[in-house]
UniProtKB/Swiss-Prot annotation:
Single biological process term from Gene Ontology: lysyl-tRNA aminoacylation
UniProt EC number: 6.1.1.6
Protein name in the entry: Lysine--tRNA ligase
Membrane-spanning parts: none
Record Gene3D superfamilies: Bira Bifunctional Protein, Domain 2 (3.30.930.10), Nucleic acid-binding proteins (2.40.50.140)
InterPro entries (UniProt xref): Aa-tRNA-synt_II, aa-tRNA-synth_II, aa-tRNA-synth_II/BPL/LPL, Lys-tRNA-ligase_II, Lys-tRNA-ligase_II_bac/euk, Lys-tRNA-ligase_II_N, Lys-tRNA-synth_II_C, NA-bd_OB-fold
Keyword Secreted assigned: no
Cofactor: Mg(2+)
Catalytic reactions on record: tRNA(Lys) + L-lysine + ATP = L-lysyl-tRNA(Lys) + AMP + diphosphate
Subunit structure and binding partners: Homodimer.
Keywords (A to Z) from UniProt: Aminoacyl-tRNA synthetase, ATP-binding, Cytoplasm, Ligase, Magnesium, Metal-binding, Nucleotide-binding, Protein biosynthesis
Taxonomic lineage: Bacteria, Bacillati, Bacillota, Bacilli, Bacillales
Length: 495
């Protein structure tokens, strides 16, 4: 802590004690406010200075917020207070509020939470303001706010002390308001489509539903190892078996992996499943839902991201993964007939691969290393190889591939979906193949889930499923470069 900061805090604590000595509670209780700052402006800014003077008797208001500016000496002063909706100016005069309250006003510091009752007026410059009739200290701020002209310059401090970021950065506050609206519109859209929102466990006995490393925990009373969920998928598909034909869940998912501008150890996903649908139906649903959200929240289906206009309004491109790789690299994996040939092609095109990778893994590496970052406008990539899609249904025309798609926008994956595998015999074989991969060192391979296979053995209808990372979608729609910009409290390394 700097010496200047320490001095300011000492002065504030001295003021705190002075208030207590005067019998004033520096940390107040309830305050009855009539309006927010934006409501006052909307209601009263339409009137002229003279009209407001005539309406003074009917313009009595009460407002509360954080003291952001303060100026004036002697027997009067101006200030701006800030609430969630913005800022409004207040005017405090000694002959209006009385000696005792004006003394409290003089001791007020930037950052204090205050309540004001008064009437509306306009200054000579035309600024709508509240003329205080009474002034109440609601919470004494013992630490000074960041400098009003420079704010929080340290990006890491913004993430670690999000409350300061929200106080001083209007854009940051708006991002999180928009995040809430995005999720709300997602719910509205799905509910109108007849989907049922459900809740499923976050602690699993088996980590499944995605290729990811789980967080491991322990249940003391049961002496059992549990895994924080890496996906919502398998429980929702059990509900499809049970006859809940259209279900979704929005919730936290946990993956024990690296931290980056796109990854946080815990993040928010939506997964949904629709009986009697396939991945083509889910493509349509995804496109229509994202377009609807953008239109409802932002008023346009065309959004800006990193100086690029992203067109969510026009029909989205749909491209088989093999064709996407061929367009960029010239390699046609339809004509690759062995793992050995795929390995040779990887070496020729400088594709990094690891031991034990097969045809499908190598095709996926071609895509991720050469193609993915080129997909700026919304593009559905479909037909992923079976080796990397253990829960997706085989394509009936070419069993090397599955009826699966991923959505890419601005070079990033935003959704993953497929026609769900509902054959319990095939599913068991896929899990067994995953166990072999795990023995060979792939710690993201699936475990065997006997309970899930048993559920499939009772019969699951043809089903389309979808997963969307909500954080990445919010990044896209709010033009935020890092996932930390859209998480109120992102994971940060300990100091």
């Amino acid at each position: 802590m700097s010496e200047e900061m320490n001095d300011q805090m000492q002065v504030r604590r001295q003021k705190l004690q002075e208030l207590i000595d005067l019998g004033i509670d520096p940390f107040g209780h309830r305050f009855n406010r009539s309006s927010t700052s934006s409501e006052l402006k909307e209601q009263w800014d339409q009137f002229s200075k003279e009209e407001l003077h005539e309406k003074e008797d009917e313009s009595h208001v009460s407002i509360a917020g954080r003291l952001m500016t303060k100026r004036g000496k002697g027997k009067a002063g101006f200030a701006h207070i800030q609430d969630l909706k913005g800022q409004i100016q207040i005017y405090v005069r000694k002959d209006q509020v009385g000696d005792d309250q004006f003394n409290i006003w003089k001791m007020a510091d930037l950052g204090d939470i205050i309540g004001v009752e008064g009437v509306m007026f306009k200054t000579n410059t035309g600024e709508i303001s509240v003329k205080a009739k009474s002034f109440t200290l609601l919470s004494k701020s013992l630490r000074p706010l960041p400098d009003k002209f420079h704010g929080l310059q340290d990006i890491e401090q913004r993430y670690r002390q999000r409350y300061l970021d929200l106080i001083t950065n209007e854009d940051s506050t708006q991002t999180f308001i928009n995040r809430s609206k995005i999720i709300q519109e997602m719910r509205n859209y799905l509910n109108k489509q007849g989907f049922l929102e459900v809740e499923t466990p976050m602690m699993h006995q088996i980590a499944g539903g995605a290729a990811a490393r789980p967080f491991v925990t322990h249940h003391n009373a049961l002496d059992a190892t549990l895994y924080m969920r890496i996906a919502i998928e398998l429980h929702l598909k059990r509900l499809i078996v049970g006859g809940l034909e259209k279900v979704y869940e929005i919730g936290r998912v946990f993956r024990n992996e690296g931290v980056s501008t796109r990854h946080n150890p815990e993040f928010t996903m939506i997964e949904l499943y629709e009986a009697y649908a396939d991945y083509h139906d889910i493509m349509d649903l995804t496109e229509n839902m994202v377009r609807h959200i953008a239109q409802e929240v932002f008023g346009s289906a065309k959004v800006q991201y990193n100086d690029e206009e992203i067109d969510l309004e026009s029909s989205w491109k749909r491209l088989h993964i093999v064709d996407a790789v061929k367009e960029v690299t010239g390699v046609d994996f339809y004509n690759v007939n062995s793992d050995e040939e795929a390995i040779r092609l990887a070496k020729e095109h400088d594709i990094e691969i690891t031991e034990n990778m097969k045809y499908g893994h190598i095709l996926n590496e071609f895509f991720e290393q050469k193609v993915e970052e080129t997909l700026i406008q919304p593009t559905f990539i479909y037909g992923h190889p079976i080796e990397i899609s253990p829960l997706a249904k085989k394509n009936p025309n070419d069993e090397r591939f599955t009826d699966r798609f991923e959505l890419f926008i601005v070079g990033r994956e935003h959704a993953n979906a497929f026609t769900e595998l509902n054959d319990p015999i095939d599913q068991r074989q896929r899990f067994e193949a995953q166990l072999v991969e795990k023995e060979q060192g792939n710690d993201e391979a699936h475990d065997m889930d006997e309970d899930y296979i048993e559920a499939l053995e009772y019969g699951m209808p043809p089903t389309g499923g979808l997963g969307i990372g909500i954080d990445r979608l919010v990044m896209l729609l709010t033009d935020s470069p890092s996932i930390r910009d859209v998480l109120l409290f992102p994971y940060m390394r300990q100091k």
